[in-house]
């Protein structure tokens, strides 16, 4: 989630914070007995280019490459409506609880927030929002974004 260097932080620490963010987001989505419908993503190419600088053109390709069109969104919504209860149950069984992760971080003295790494609190929510364009895999960030849940979630991340 951190595209630019952040003095005083190590990549592994950044990955650790991002892991907790993903765990919180996953827990929030798995708490939903029914999902809101996925929406077709409207991709703002120019915004992606601005946010990702010299990697912007590649990130635009990534975003478009994994975005669902209207038909794929309709099909996925039908599938999620049909399969969500079983999928949710299965994921809840195997998900490592956030509390266990937080306890391990605390026991090892590992920072658990971007603020704990000394990163500007205004930066991290934007990093969470823009991270979905970095990988060509459809991730929990894409699910949350397409469900309309990512922006509200990200604004509370620190």
Predicted ranges, named:
Residues 32-158:
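C-terminal charged capping/lid subdomain of soluble metabolic enzymes
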Residues 1-28:
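Acidic catalytic cores of enzymes that act on phosphate-bearing nucleotides/polynucleotides
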